[in-house]
Amino acid sequence: FGTIFLTPLFGSIYDKYGKGATLMIIGSCLLTFVHVMFALPINSWVLAIVLMLILGIAFGLVPSAMWPSVPKIIPMKLLGTAYALIFYIQNIGLALIPVWIGKVNQANTGVDGVIDYTQTMTIFAAFGVIAIIISFLLLFEDKRKGYGLQKPNVK
């Protein structure tokens, strides 16, 4: 729910101050942190609420920096193709990952019907680590080629 308000806020921060790759790194680190914490055997509703709030911040940070960064990296004549490929990959993930996670949850369901989500959260944390790596690669590539990911969009 927080991403509804936070994504435009973070987008305006990116427009004004830049630091797109940094915002993606921070968001990816927060995402990973939350899933690692959820994988731990801690049973606290207060912690769960705090972690969900942090997750909302992470889900606001990453797209607010990712989408406006695409035209900085991809030539204008290939921008439609680039966005199409991004949505294509995203839709593959939306189609296949829930099936995989469902199988993992089913395999981790005890005879009493209680599901152990440790492996599921570890998978999501691994996706977060991949996002961190990709974000750092974008930062390094931006420094090398000068795409302007760290520069503001509005002057």
Where are these regions (language model features)?
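Intracellular helix-loop hinge segments at the cytoplasmic ends of transmembrane helices
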Residues: 67-73
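A late C-terminal transmembrane helix in Major Facilitator Superfamily
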Residues: 76-110
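Helix-to-loop junctions at the C-terminal end of transmembrane segments
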Residues: 6-19, 105
